[in-house]
C-alpha cells in the first residue's frame, strides 16, 4: 500500500527528499572507491529485502532512489530502507 505525500513528508528522514513517487538522496564520499563500497553494502541490504533501489554512481557521489513500482509509489519499505541506508553511511 502506498503512502500519501503527507505521510511520506512526515516520516521521511531529513537527509532524503521526495520527488514525485520516489524518495532520493545523494551521498557524498571522499573518493570513488569508498562510494563503490557503500553501493556494495546497500546492495546486500536491498537483496535481503528483495527491494532494489535505482543507484547512480558518480566520481565521489552515489544517488539512491527508492519507490515501489509494483505498488505504484512510496511504501513503508522505502522509508525503512532509507533509514537502513543512512545507518550504513
Predicted regions: what is each one?
Residues 2-89:
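Long, contiguous binding/interaction regions
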Amino acid at each position: 500500500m502506498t503512502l500519501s505525500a503527507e505521510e511520506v513528508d512526515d516520516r521521511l528522514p531529513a537527509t532524503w527528499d521526495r520527488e514525485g513517487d520516489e524518495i532520493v538522496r545523494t551521498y557524498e564520499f571522499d573518493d570513488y572507491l569508498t562510494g563503490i563500497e557503500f553501493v556494495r553494502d546497500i546492495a546486500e541490504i536491498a537483496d535481503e529485502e528483495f527491494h532494489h533501489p535505482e543507484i547512480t554512481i558518480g566520481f565521489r557521489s552515489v544517488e539512491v532512489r527508492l519507490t515501489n513500482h509494483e505498488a505504484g509509489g512510496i511504501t513503508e519499505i522505502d522509508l525503512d530502507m532509507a533509514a537502513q541506508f543512512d545507518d550504513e553511511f
